[in-house]
Design a protein with these regions (language model features):
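Beta-turn initiation residues at beta-strand->coil junctions
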Residues: 1-6, 15-23, 35-41, 56-66, ...
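A residue-level detector for well-ordered beta-strand positions
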Residues: 4-6, 25, 46-47, 68, ...
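Short, acidic, Ser/Thr-enriched surface-loop or helix-capping motifs
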Residues: 8, 28, 38, 49-50, ...
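Tandem repeat domain/solenoid detector
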Residues: 24-35, 45-47, 57, 67-75, ...
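Extended, small-residue-rich solenoid/repeat segments and analogous flexible loops
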Residues: 42, 311-332, 336
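Structured, non-catalytic alpha/beta "coupling" segments that mediate domain-domain communication
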Residues: 282-319, 391-394
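A motif-centric feature for acidic-aromatic and gly/ser/thr-rich catalytic loops and repeats
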Residues: 305-319, 421-475
Length: 475
C-alpha cells in the first residue's frame, strides 16, 4: 500500500510524508513561505521586508544567495547573486515603460540584454537582443497568433498560421517553402497532417484513426497512426496506458512486423515489456516511493520467465532522502545540500544561482550560461561557443561556428521542422510524442530514431544519421 500524508498548520500545508521521509514547509505570520526542508534538512529559505513586505533574499543550502531590490513602484529593479564563498555580483537589471511593462532587461553574467515592445493591447509584440537577434508576434482580431518572425541578425524566418471557425489551427505556412495542413473529425480530434510544397504537391502525410465509440464513450487516444514508411497500431488499458504497439511496414518493405506489449501494476507503473523491437523481455521493480530499483532483461518471451536474467541493473537510494539515487549499476552519485548532483562516476557537475547547471566536466568541459528567465542562452564546449536564441520558452535558432540552425513551430509550440544548412527536415512523432523520424522536403525519410520505454535513445539510422541525425538536438 502506498500513501502520502499531508499535514497543515492554520490551513497551510506544513508537511508531506512520502516514502518514509518528509517535505516540510514553514511560513511567517503573513503566510509567506520562509523555508522548505527535505528529510529534515533545510534546502531553501526566504527573507522578506517587515510587515508582509517584498521578498528580499533567496538563500540556498549550497551557499548561493540571490538578493532583490525594487523601484519606487515595487517592481524588480536589480537582483544580485552571491555564490557560495564568493563576493556579491550583479545578476539582472530591469527597466519598465510608462505603462508598467518590462521594456529592457540585462543579465550581467551572460551579457544578454533584451528590449521588449508591446502593441496597444499590451501584448508582447517584439523582442530584440544586443546582437540584433529579434523575434516578433502578430495577432488577429481573435487574439490568435497569425505570424511569427525571427532573425539571427543576418537571415530571417517567417512562419504564418491560419485557423478554422472554431479557433483550431488549420495551416502552418513557411512562405515559399512548405505548408502543413491539419484535418479534424467532428469531435475535434486530429485525423491527418500533411506537408506540401509551395506548388501544392504533398511530400509527407500522417493519418490517425480512433477506436469506434461504445457505450457512450468517445476515445481521444489514437488506435492507429500511418506515416511515411509504416503504420503503428495501439491498444490501451482502462487507465489509458499503452498495452500494445505494433509497427507494420508498408507493402513492399523487407522489414518485419514488430510488436511490443506492456504490463502495469495498480499504480500504473510499467512492470514488464515484451519487446520484439529490442528482442528482449524487460522486468522493472520499484520501491514504495515509485523509484526504480531494478531492471532485469531476459531473452524475448511472452511466457514464464526463467529464474536468471541475461542482464540485471540495480539502484540504491539515500537512507534519509529516500528519493535520492546514490548508485545505479555500480556508478556512484553524490549531491550538494540542495539536491543538485555533484558527481556521477567520473563526471563532475557544478552549479550556479542555486539550481542552474554551470559546468559538466567528464574529460570535456561544457559550460552553460542563462538569461533573466533562466533559459540557457550559451554553451561553451572546449572553447567552441553555441549561442541559443529564444522566443519565449521556445528555441528559435542556434548559431555555432558561423552557421545557424533554425526551428519551426506550430501555434501550439510543437516542433514542426528543423532547418540545417538551408535544408528543411520535417519532424515525425509517434503517439508517445517521441520524434521517430526526420523527412526531407522531397518526402524521403533520412533519419530514424528508436527509443526505449523511458525515452532513452537506442539507435539512429538512415542516410543522414551521422550528420542531420546527430545535429538535431530534439531526440
Amino acid at each position: 500500500m502506498v500513501k502520502n500524508i499531508y499535514t497543515y498548520t492554520k490551513d497551510r500545508l506544513a508537511g508531506i510524508e512520502h516514502n518514509g521521509f518528509n517535505y516540510g514547509f514553514t511560513y511567517d505570520v503573513f503566510g509567506n513561505t520562509t523555508a522548505v526542508s527535505i528529510a529534515g534538512n533545510q534546502v531553501i529559505s526566504y527573507e522578506y521586508e517587515a510587515q508582509n513586505g517584498k521578498l528580499l533574499k533567496t538563500i540556498y543550502a549550497n551557499g548561493d544567495e540571490i538578493r532583490y531590490t525594487y523601484d519606487t513602484q515595487d517592481r524588480f529593479s536589480i537582483s544580485y547573486l552571491k555564490p557560495a564563498g564568493s563576493s556579491e555580483q550583479r545578476l539582472n537589471s530591469y527597466i519598465y515603460n510608462k505603462e508598467g511593462n518590462l521594456c529592457k532587461v540585462t543579465n550581467h553574467l551572460s551579457g544578454k540584454t533584451y528590449e521588449l515592445d508591446y502593441d496597444f493591447l499590451d501584448r508582447l509584440m517584439r523582442v530584440r537582443d544586443e546582437s540584433g537577434v529579434c523575434y516578433e508576434y502578430t495577432y488577429d482580431a481573435n487574439n490568435q497568433m497569425i505570424r511569427m518572425f525571427h532573425t539571427d541578425g543576418r537571415a530571417k524566418l517567417t512562419t504564418g498560421y491560419t485557423y478554422d471557425k472554431d479557433g483550431r489551427e488549420k495551416e502552418v505556412r513557411m512562405a515559399g517553402k512548405f505548408t502543413r495542413s491539419t484535418d479534424y473529425d467532428n469531435l475535434g480530434r486530429v485525423t491527418k497532417q500533411s506537408f506540401s510544397a509551395e506548388n501544392g504537391d504533398t511530400s509527407m502525410s500522417m493519418t490517425y484513426k480512433y477506436p469506434d465509440a461504445e457505450k457512450n464513450k468517445e476515445y481521444a487516444l489514437p488506435s492507429e497512426m500511418d506515416v511515411q514508411e509504416c503504420s503503428y497500431s495501439y491498444k490501451y488499458d482502462r487507465n489509458g496506458n499503452i498495452t500494445e504497439i505494433q509497427r507494420v511496414p508498408h507493402k513492399g518493405s523487407t522489414e518485419k512486423i514488430l510488436k511490443d506489449t506492456f504490463q502495469y501494476d495498480e499504480r500504473n507503473q510499467l512492470i514488464r515489456e515484451n519487446s520484439q523491437s529490442q528482442d528482449k523481455t524487460i522486468v522493472y521493480a520499484y520501491d514504495q516511493g515509485g523509484n526504480l530499483k531494478s531492471v532485469k532483461e531476459y531473452a524475448y518471451t511472452e511466457g514464464t520467465l526463467p529464474e536468471t536474467p541475461v542482464h540485471e541493473e540495480t539502484g540504491t537510494y539515500s537512507s534519509t532522502w529516500k528519493d535520492q539515487l546514490l548508485n545505479w549499476d555500480g556508478t556512484a552519485m553524490t549531491y550538494d545540500a540542495v539536491g543538485n548532483m555533484l558527481t556521477r562516476g567520473d563526471t563532475v557537475y557544478t552549479w550556479t544561482m542555486g539550481r542552474k547547471l554551470a559546468c559538466v566536466d567528464n574529460g570535456r568541459k561544457a559550460q552553460y550560461f542563462y538569461d533573466h528567465t533562466g533559459a540557457r542562452v550559451k554553451k561553451v564546449v572546449d572553447g567552441v561557443i553555441t549561442n541559443y536564441h529564444m522566443a519565449g520558452d521556445l528555441l528559435a535558432s542556434e548559431t555555432c561556428n558561423g552557421g545557424t540552425t533554425w526551428y519551426v513551430y506550430d501555434s501550439g509550440a510543437n516542433l514542426v521542422a528543423i532547418i540545417i544548412a538551408g535544408k528543411y527536415y520535417y519532424y515525425v512523432r509517434n503517439v508517445q510524442n517521441d520524434i521517430v523520424a526526420l523527412v526531407d522536403d522531397s518526402g524521403k525519410t533520412v533519419v530514424n530514431y528508436v527509443y526505449d520505454s523511458w525515452g532513452k535513445l537506442l539507435s539512429i539510422t538512415g542516410s543522414l544519421k551521422d550528420t542531420v541525425g546527430i545535429q538535431n538536438p530534439f531526440r
